[in-house]
Amino acid sequence: MRLWFCLSFFIVLCLEHFPETLADERNVPESEEKTEQYLRDLPKINRKGPRPPGFSPFRGKFHSQSLRDLPKINRKGPRPPGFSPFRGKFHSQSLRDLPKINRKGPRPPGFSPFRGKFHSQSLRDLPKINRKGPRPPGFSPFRGKFHSQSLRDLPKINRKGPRPPGFSPFRGKFHSQSLRDLPKINRKGPRPPGFSPFRGKFHSQSHV
């Protein structure tokens, strides 16, 4: 009993004489450490002055890290397309790479004014498509995208004229991508071994 009492008394004395070691580690919560490390990467923010857009003084951090890369946004003035003043962030990060879109004017193909984003990101790489004029093969005006991305690499195909072997005008794509690497096959002439004129492809890819 005497040894136990002496040990406990010695520990209490150590804590009183060295308060900067164990006492400070117990008093610092984990949440404050995380917020301090997070704010160290940001410029100094005056809590009483104007704050950057999306910054919450209660949490001590930004609502969205994407706002750190954007210029300062005037909440009372015009906002970039797809920006929500309530959440303080964009509906879609893909809009950051697009030019400003006038919601009342003509919009790029496949852009939805309700969702504030494109139906398909593949449309961003395509030139502007006139919905009332001729459309590229395989393009659906209802979905605002291509039925098959493989058609983007092919030259424009005339649906009323001769089509490449294996191309289906109904599906707007090839029955087999392996035919793209083969020379044009004359269906009425001699065919390579293993080629089926009905399926428009080889029975076995090993023949290629």
UniProtKB/Swiss-Prot annotation:
Region (Disordered): 27-208
Broad class of the protein's primary localization: secreted
Cellular component annotations (GO), alphabetically ordered: extracellular region
Keywords: Amphibian defense peptide, G-protein coupled receptor impairing toxin, Repeat, Secreted, Signal, Toxin, Vasoactive, Vasodilator
Residue stretches of biased makeup (Basic and acidic residues): 27-44
InterPro entries, alphabetized: Bradykinin
Record localization: Secreted
GO MF annotation list: hormone activity; toxin activity
Pfam families to which the protein is assigned, alphabetical: Bradykinin (PF06753)
Tissue-wise expression: Expressed by the skin glands.
Gene Ontology biological process terms, A to Z: defense response; positive regulation of smooth muscle contraction; vasodilation
Signal peptide residue numbers: 1-23
Family: Belongs to the bradykinin-related peptide family.
General function of this protein: In vitro, produces constriction of guinea pig ileum smooth muscle. May target bradykinin receptors (BDKRB).
Record's protein name: Kininogen-1b
Native source species: Bombina maxima
